[in-house]
């Protein structure tokens, strides 16, 4: 398994990601993201794409992130409409990160694939920080019980006002992903 990220991702891998996303979220599901929307989301910037592939370059899992401005996030937060989100890419200075989607093929769940993606993501964030690209705040929305576990245990995010009794809803991380990066890389640096 290896991780491919950002601009290294070609159209074939992107199509595999869309296919896997649609296996989990079919068109009749309220969380379905249309193919045209996913392409539009990354047409100007592939910052935030982290794909795990096998030895034959077949996608086995992914994490997608986007960078938004405050007005765009607020519009999404108020409407609940995923399609209003616009990926502006990571810019020098402060950035708002939206942790978008993650998925691992069923046969690879529990294999450590998501942890490897997380390490690649954390390493990339640290590299960007050194170049003057900062994450000032991160947001995510948990739409499944597994998503709740990811945002609370994996990212250690705090619930926002709309989180319901099951944990579904929006979460925030105000430290700019610093603790997450440390956690993901601590066992590598031992």
Per-segment meaning from a language model:
Residues 1-61, 67:
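Short amphipathic alpha-helix that is part of the acyltransferase structural core
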Residues 5-9, 24, 28-29, 102-106, ...:
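Terminal substrate-recognition subdomain of acyl/acetyltransferases
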Residues 21, 63, 118-121, 141, ...:
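Polar/charged side chains located within well-ordered beta-strands of beta-rich proteins
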Residues 55-58, 72, 131-134:
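Short, solvent-exposed loop/turn segments that connect beta-strands within catalytic domains
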Residues 104, 110-126:
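Conserved acetyl-CoA-binding loop-helix of GNAT-fold acetyltransferases
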């Amino acid at each position: 398994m290896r991780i491919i990220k950002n601009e290294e991702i070609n159209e074939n891998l992107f199509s595999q990601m869309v296919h896997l996303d649609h296996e989990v979220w079919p068109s009749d599901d309220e969380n379905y993201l249309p193919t045209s929307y996913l392409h539009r989301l990354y047409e100007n910037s592939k910052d935030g794409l982290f794909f795990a592939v096998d030895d034959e370059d077949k996608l086995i899992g992914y994490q997608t992130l986007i960078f938004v401005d405050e007005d765009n996030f607020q519009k999404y937060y108020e409407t609940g409409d995923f399609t209003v989100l616009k990926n502006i890419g990571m810019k020098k200075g402060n950035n708002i990160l939206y942790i978008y989607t993650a998925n691992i093929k069923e046969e690879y769940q529990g294999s450590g694939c998501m942890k490897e993606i997380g390490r690649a993501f954390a390493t990339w964030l640290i590299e960007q920080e050194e170049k003057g690209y900062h994450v000032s705040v991160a947001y995510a929305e948990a739409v499944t019980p597994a998503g709740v576990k990811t945002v609370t245990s994996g990212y250690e995010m705090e619930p926002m006002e709309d989180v319901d009794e099951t944990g579904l809803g929006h979460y925030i991380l105000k430290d700019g992903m610093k603790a997450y990066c440390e956690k993901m890389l601590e066992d590598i640096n031992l």
